[in-house]
């Protein structure tokens, strides 16, 4: 598939491009249904719907945000960004179209990243995490913050370019529910083996 054709497909609402086991790629298009959880009480029913859909032989692709943690452990403190789903999955009738990615190494990058935290805020939050670790209240923490930058290219082209320059084993492009999510990860966070996630 040519780069232009792939970018056009990624623009379509309901599209998910994800790395498949091995070295291939799968492109999902035209979902039969979307399941979205915007608050903690909707997370468990969304997972039940996911289980029913895939149990009937359907396919699903989507994301679970870190902020969904409170649905599994009410003690987890999270800060949900306004308007961003805790969980969103698209349900598909057919398996993904398998494809090879075209060369997209054209050097499209984001410049002028502006962190949402000042250096002082960053140091304060690191100190707070360290204090919790030393007190034995936690054994690990995911401390992340957003950076913002003006986007001078289409997000689809940015994803393909980043992937060309930074290949990772687990990557995905998600385009539904008003979200265009670019994910390039060296690790797998969730995996199912029959009855267990």
Language-model features: locations:
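Extended alpha-helical targeting/anchoring segments
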Residues: 1-197
């Amino acid at each position: 598939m040519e780069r232009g054709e792939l970018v056009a497909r990624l623009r379509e609402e309901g599209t998910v491009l994800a790395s498949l086991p091995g070295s291939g790629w799968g492109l999902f298009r035209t979902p039969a249904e979307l399941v979205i959880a915007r608050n903690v009480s909707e997370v468990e029913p969304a997972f039940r719907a996911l289980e029913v859909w895939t149990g009937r032989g359907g396919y699903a692709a989507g994301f679970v945000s870190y902020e969904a943690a409170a649905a599994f452990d009410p003690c987890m403190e999270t800060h949900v960004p306004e308007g961003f789903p805790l969980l969103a999955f698209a349900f598909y009738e057919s398996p993904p179209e398998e494809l090879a990615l075209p060369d997209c190494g054209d050097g499209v990058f984001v410049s002028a990243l502006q962190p949402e935290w000042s250096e002082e805020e960053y140091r304060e939050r690191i100190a707070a995490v360290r204090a919790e670790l030393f007190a034995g209240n936690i054994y690990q923490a995911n401390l992340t913050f957003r950076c913002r930058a003006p986007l001078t290219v289409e997000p689809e082209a940015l994803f393909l370019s980043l992937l060309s320059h930074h290949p990772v084993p687990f990557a995905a492009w998600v385009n539904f529910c008003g979200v265009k999510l670019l994910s390039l990860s060296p690790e797998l966070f969730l995996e199912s083996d029959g009855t267990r996630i």
